[in-house]
A protein has these predicted regions:
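Solvent-exposed interhelical
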Residues: 183
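Hydrophobic alpha-helical transmembrane segments
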Residues: 1-174, 178, 186-324
Length: 324
């Protein structure tokens, strides 16, 4: 039942994406984080240790609450009718996955350039990256879009599928809460260096396995989408650790090698130049078509993840059933 529900949610995500008018659980999570942050900061001592403790409470409480709430809803739906539980789990899976939205927002950058030039493209890419886009040239904008697809292939699709297949919608929603916490408070700036410490470390931990599986799946599907599997494997082995995060360079290095591009490197954040190592080799100049190539790679790896993770769950269920 869970496998079919997740597959239905995945299909719905590819078909419909995230309509702006539809309420989304991530928005609710964001509001809960904002609400809880102020109260937790006031409830704990105003010291580094106290602030870290407050952040730890939030890092544990929100994913647990989201998972339990989802489990409760599914349980109530199941008491009414098994079919209603299936629909609810498929709906939750649809809300958790972000393949279509990642594709739409990245391709919108190239579309903006074709319609409005560099200024429009900078504005479009500014919606999906945290760096200062006003200083980017054409190649810089295209590179930022490709990097976004590569970095979020795991967080937005593969990792949610991984946890959905392990623990259904409750575990998938708990993962989404961890991911949302990291995106909101997992920064190493003055405000969040202590409060966001637990959230950032938890996000690193839960993404450790999925990010590596995502990179391997990207390499595996390269021949299907006409990209360089050998190059992807070579650059992944060489550059997968070239990032401050233990996970971010996994998929980025595989994508860079598959496309024959050099990604990452120095970038401007809040008016300051941040030095970061490059990933990949500049076998050729980046072009606007690389955004579409990166999205095809992401989508192919996502479908592969659905099949592989679903088959693994089915095998475990059958094995457990045979032992019973």
């Amino acid at each position: 039942m869970t496998i079919l529900a997740v597959a239905a949610g995945f299909a719905a995500d590819l078909a419909f994406g995230d309509p702006r008018w539809l309420p989304h659980p991530v928005v609710a999570m964001g509001r809960a984080i904002t609400w809880a942050e102020g109260r937790l900061r006031r409830a704990f001592p105003q010291t580094p240790a106290g602030t870290r403790a407050a952040g730890l409470v939030l890092a544990v409480a929100l994913p647990l609450a989201c998972g339990l709430l989802t489990w409760g809803i599914l349980h109530l739906c199941g008491m009414v009718h098994p079919g209603l539980r299936f629909v609810a789990e498929a709906w939750a899976s649809y809300q958790i996955l972000a393949a279509c939205e990642l594709r739409r927002q990245s391709l919108a950058v190239a579309h903006a350039f074709s319609k409005g030039g560099l200024v429009a493209a900078r504005e479009a890419v500014g919606l999906i990256v945290g760096r200062d886009t006003s200083v980017l040239d054409e190649q810089g904008v295209a590179r930022a879009a490709v990097e976004t697809v590569a970095e979020n292939a795991s967080d937005g699709v593969t990792a949610p599928l991984f946890y959905l297949m392990i623990g259904g919608a409750p575990l998938g929603m708990a993962y989404k809460a961890v991911n949302t916490l990291d995106s909101m408070v997992g920064y190493k700036n003055e405000r969040y260096i202590d409060f966001g410490c637990a959230s950032a470390r938890l996000d690193d931990a839960v993404n450790w396995i999925p990010s590596r599986l995502s990179a391997l799946l990207m390499i595996a599907v390269c021949p299907i989408v006409g990209l360089d599997a050998r190059g992807a494997a070579r650059i992944w082995r060489r550059d997968r650790r070239r990032h401050a995060s233990p996970n971010a360079a996994q998929t980025e290095s595989a994508c860079a090698g598959a496309l024959g591009l050099r990604l990452a490197g120095p970038a401007v954040y809040f008016g300051k130049l941040v030095e970061k190592p490059t990933i990949g080799d500049a076998s050729r100049e980046i072009e606007w078509g690389d955004i579409a190539r990166a999205t095809r790679l992401m989508l192919a790896a996502s479908v592969c993840a659905l099949v592989v993770f679903g088959a693994a769950r089915a095998a475990v269920v059958l094995a457990v059933g045979a032992m019973a």
